[in-house]
C-alpha cells in the first residue's frame, strides 16, 4: 500500500485531468497506449474530443476513493509512538488540502481535536498551502462539535489575521460552535448578535443555512417569540425557507412536546407551498406518538401511505416503541406485521424496539425470544441489543436474570461496552445489590473499561438518592449542613454521609474504581512527563506535545474534587 501511494506509477494522467477546474469546457488530447511485448513496437492512438460529463464524474469519484484510501492509511499509522506530523512528513509529496479536509473529519469523529490543530500547523508550513475560508470553517466546525468554543474563536481571529475575509459559511460554523456550549441562554444571545452582525456585512449576508441553525436552536429552547421573529425576518429577506427549515423547527418543537407550536409551523409550511418529505412525516409520527396522541399519529401514517413518499424503517420503529410505552401490544405487533408485508427488512434497531416494546408491556418471555432469535441468526449482535434486553429485565424487577445474561453475554457473541456497565451499575445500586456492584467493578477493571467523568457524577447522584431524607425539599439543607459538619480532607465529606457499613462498602468500590482510573491516566503520561516540563513547550501550549498531558492533569484534579 505504501509503495502504491508513493511510487511514480500512482501519478496517473487521470489525476492530472481531475485537477483541471470544472468550469472549463476545453477539448483535451487523450492518449490510448497499448503496451505489448518488449520486442514489439509501442502503438499510440491519438484522438481528440470533448470529455463527457459522465467520465468527469467517474474520474472525480475515483480521485475521492484514492483520497480516502490514503487518509485511512494515515489514520491507521497514528499511534503514541509515532507522532502524526512525522507520518505526514513521510507522505509530504502526496498529501494535499483535500486529504487534510478528510483528516479533519476522521480526527473529529475520534475525539482527537488536538491532532486537527497539528495537521493545520503542518499545512501552514507547506508550499501549496493558501489561506482559505473553507479550511478555517471546517476547523471551527470540528472544534464546536467537541465543545472547544475558545479554540473556535481563536481560529476565527487567526483567519482574519491571515488575510481571509469571513463569509456566511464561516459565521455559520461559528454560530454552531457557540450552540454546543452548556450555557444555552448565553449562547442564544451570542448567536443573535452574530446574525445582526452578518446583516451589516455585504459579503456575509445570512443564507438559508443560517436561519435553519438559528430557528432550530431557538425552537429547542422553547422560545416561540424568537422563532416567530426569525420567520418574519426570513419572509422579509430575499432568502426563501426550504423543507429543512420547517423540519428542523417541527422536530425541535415535537421533542419538547409542544404540539400546538409544531402544528403552527406545519400550517406555515403549507402556506409557503413547501411539500413535506419523509422526514416531515417521521417527525409528525414520532411527536404525536410521544404525546400518546395516537389518533393523529395514525392519520399521519395514512396520509403518508397515500402520498408519493414511502415509509422508512424509522417510521415503523417510532410507532412500535410509542405503542409499547402505552402498553398497546396488539397495535405494535400490527405495525411489525405491516412492515414485513411491505417487504421491509427489520434492522437491529427494529428488533431492539420490539424487545423494549415487550418489556414495557411486561411480556419478558417474548422479549427474550426475540433476543435469542437475533443471537442465533447470522446477524452480529450489538451491545445496544444486549443493553435493551438487560433494561427489560431490570424494568420488570428481574435483576438476577439480568446478571446471568450479563455474565453469559459471550455465548451470544456480544461484548458489553461502557454503556452496559453504566446501566447495570445504576440498576444494581438502586436495587441495593452491593455484592453485584463489587463484582461489576472488578469485571469492569478486568475488561479495561475506563470510566469517564459522567460515570462518577452519576454514581454520586445514585448514592445521594439512596440517602435518608434525600428528597428535593431537603437537598439545600443537606448541602448547607455538609459544609459545617463534615471534616476536612479528601473523601471526608462523603464518608460522613454514608454512616452505615453497607453504604461505606459500596462507596469504597467506587473509590477503588476512581483510583484505578487515575493510575491508568498517570501511566499514560509517564513517558512524556519530562518533556512537559521544558520551558520552550510552556510558551506554546496550543500545538505542543504536552497539551494532552495538561488535559489529563486537569481531569485528575477534577475527579479529585468530585470524589
UniProtKB/Swiss-Prot annotation:
Q: Name one GO molecular function term.
A: mRNA binding
Record's keyword terms, sorted: Chloroplast, Plastid, Repeat, Transit peptide
Annotated region described as Disordered, given as residue ranges: 468-501, 520-551
Please indicate if the UniProt record lists Repeat as a keyword.
Answer: yes
What GO cellular-component annotations does this UniProt entry give?
A: chloroplast
Q: Which family does it belong to?
A: Belongs to the PPR family. P subfamily.
Q: What is this protein called?
A: Pentatricopeptide repeat-containing protein At4g39620, chloroplastic
Organism equals Arabidopsis thaliana (Mouse-ear cress)
Q: Which gene encodes it?
A: EMB2453
